[in-house]
Amino acid sequence: MSVGILGTKVGMTQFFDEAGLSIPVTVIQVGPCVITQIKAVSTDGYNAIQVGYKQVAEQKLNKPLLGHLKKSQAPPLKYLREYEMKSTDDFEVSQILSTDLFQVGQKINVSSRSVGKGFSGYQKRHHFSRGPMSHGSKNHRQPGSIGAGTTPGRVYPGKNMAGQLGNKKVTIKNLQIVSINSENDLLIVKGAVPGKPGALVKISK
């Protein structure tokens, strides 16, 4: 993984290119992020930079985290994430990362937590076909058989069944940057990004 940045999903809109074509895009408020720590092979076993994002009141953080941030003279930051890389020579503690890292046309990977749908059934969660709705059928939205009989005498792990839908980490790869607004720290990315408006977004090259 190469260097990246944290941000917040603003929402979706449309963007018109030079030919007048309408492109569905997601607007992401990125950074500015602060490098709070640089990890090295000699001390940590791998090379990485730790990035902090979204300043909050000191009361929101515990003392160990505040002490860690004071070492890098960083303000109280709500989110800390790491980006592992081959070399950290181009970075230093307290360095500010913003939209300058990216260029129009560049492909990026975007990770976020998908929208939670709660406890969902077989049709909504796994796209099962439903049963007959009439002629005396009592099997409208049931799964049908979930296994064999005495042998194996159990339901195999991983069987598609009803349960929690969404609210898990999702990564969309190779999203193209359509436009960059450096004044307002906005990235405009072609396509959809996981999560609700306001969700934390992790971006990497």
UniProtKB/Swiss-Prot annotation:
One of its GO terms (cellular component) is chloroplast. Pfam families: Ribosomal_L3 (PF00297). Keywords: Chloroplast, Plastid, Ribonucleoprotein, Ribosomal protein, RNA-binding, rRNA-binding. It comes from the Eukaryota. One of its GO terms (biological process) is translation. NCBIfam families: L3_bact. One of the primary rRNA binding proteins, it binds directly near the 3'-end of the 23S rRNA, where it nucleates assembly of the 50S subunit. Belongs to the universal ribosomal protein uL3 family. This is Large ribosomal subunit protein uL3c. It comes from Pyropia yezoensis (Susabi-nori). The gene is rpl3.
